[in-house]
Amino acid sequence: GHRAVVIQRTEAEPMLSNTMVENSPVHCTSVGKAILAYQPAEIVDRVIDAGLQRYTESTITDPEALRAELTRTRERGFAIDEGEHQPGLRCVGAPIRNQAGHVFAGISVSAPAWQLPLTEVDKLNQVVIYHANLISQRLGYVRS
């Protein structure tokens, strides 16, 4: 589909909301791009054909730019959202694989960009990838 379903979202501040289910666009969120990057080309084409809605000035709306971003995501093993869905928010997401090795979910961490400078993304992506791999293994995925 064209959206990623967020099952749990917890804010750092206890007084802020704790979202249980939320639909998020796959083309401009780190968790969405982490999932979309590993889908067949037909799925990516369907997302593009449905329209790449602009949410912020940073949203990727060009089909070729999205394809290039998905390629970078696969090469890195994680996705980055640089305020593409919500202004000023930086997010790092990694794919979760099922027993057959297919990416069907993702996990991400988000923070205001001023609290998560680009220099810290390399450290955070390692943590996110580690936990995505751990979840994948618990679901029966065995890396070859």
Model-identified regions with their sequence ranges:
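Short, flexible active-site loop motifs that bind/organize anionic cofactors or intermediates
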Residues: 34, 56, 111
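Amphipathic alpha-helical effector-binding/dimerization core
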Residues: 1-50
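Cysteine/selenocysteine-centered motifs that mediate thiol-based redox chemistry or coordinate metal-sulfur cofactors
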Residues: 42-54, 129-144
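Extended hydrophobic
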Residues: 61-132
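Generic alpha-helical structural context detector
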Residues: 33-37, 71, 133, 137
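Alpha-helix N-cap/loop-to-helix boundary motif
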Residues: 23, 27, 36, 58-65, ...
